[in-house]
């Protein structure tokens, strides 16, 4: 920040940055319309994940404890596809902004493949060492066993999550914020939450099987994401 302010000639965007917070109404309206679906998406997605966890909780406190351990470890590995998704948004967004649509499409395809490949490697590592992490917790053997199983399920699903996450950021880079809202949070409430509720409350399936089937709904998003990205609906000239 200090460097940017000391080198105003190289950072012309800082000129007049502190003169006021006024914004033309038309520009504000555009930002609000584009940004609102993203804000609502994060809100409803978080609420959906909380509801799914509540569905699991009807199977006992041991399940929640196991999930907490598994989620903590899984989130460390999930950083890979989360950050690669953000990279897709930046790189593809730059190409779209420059009007280089073919380069944007080529870069997007390569980065999606790279993301899935990296997460496949990370998933293999999770499967190999996932059982070690629960052992560092001072808890019961039942909870450790559940956590190990949940980690294994997350590892199996991770490459699919990488693809859907990449698809999400591809659509977002093209300004399709309403589509991403439908693709993410609406899908969570229409598909994931009902599946978790029915399986956890009205079936005799073990919690690991329930968790696997709920996580496997990601495959539906893979199909949807594939056709949406392939349709090039996101491939638009931004300026």
Q: Which residues does each PLM region occupy?
A:
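Short runs within selected transmembrane alpha-helices of multi-pass transporters and secretion channels
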Residues: 1-2, 82-85, 154-173, 179-191, ...
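Transmembrane alpha-helix boundary and packing residues in multipass membrane permease domains
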Residues: 38, 42, 50, 54, ...
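Membrane-helix interface segments
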Residues: 62-63, 177-178, 206-207
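Small-residue-rich hydrophobic transmembrane alpha-helices
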Residues: 66-130, 161-180
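Short alpha-helical transmembrane segments in multi-pass integral membrane proteins
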Residues: 1-36, 92-157, 199-239
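Hydrophobic positions within alpha-helical transmembrane segments of bacterial inner-membrane proteins
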Residues: 43, 47, 119-127, 162, ...
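Helix-terminus/linker motif at the lipid-water interface of multi-pass membrane proteins
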Residues: 43-76, 94-95, 132-141, 201-202
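Hydrophobic faces of transmembrane alpha-helices in multi-pass small-molecule transporters and flippases
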Residues: 2-3, 20-51, 76, 80, ...
């Amino acid at each position: 920040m200090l460097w940017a302010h000391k080198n105003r000639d190289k950072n012309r965007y800082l000129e007049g940055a502190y003169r006021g917070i006024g914004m033309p109404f038309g520009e504000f309206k555009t930002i609000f319309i584009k940004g609102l679906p993203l804000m609502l998406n994060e809100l409803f997605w978080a609420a959906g994940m909380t509801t799914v966890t509540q569905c699991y909780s009807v199977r006992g406190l041991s399940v929640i404890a196991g999930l907490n351990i598994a989620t903590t470890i899984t989130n460390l590995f999930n950083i890979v596809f989360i950050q690669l998704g953000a990279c897709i948004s930046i790189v593809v967004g730059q190409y779209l902004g420059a009007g280089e649509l073919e380069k944007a499409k080529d870069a997007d395809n390569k980065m999606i493949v790279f993301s899935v490949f990296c997460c496949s490697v990370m998933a293999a590592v999770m499967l190999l060492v996932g059982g070690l992490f629960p052992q560092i917790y001072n808890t019961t053997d039942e909870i450790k066993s559940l956590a190990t199983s949940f980690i294994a399920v997350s590892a199996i699903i991770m490459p699919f999550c990488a693809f859907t996450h990449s698809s999400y950021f591809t659509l977002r880079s093209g300004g399709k914020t309403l589509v991403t809202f439908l693709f993410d949070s609406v899908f969570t409430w229409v598909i994931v939450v009902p599946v978790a509720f029915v399986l956890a409350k009205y079936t005799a399936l073990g919690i690991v099987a329930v968790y696997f089937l709920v996580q496997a709904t990601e495959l539906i998003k893979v199909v949807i994401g594939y056709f949406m990205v392939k349709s090039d609906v996101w491939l638009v000239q931004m300026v």
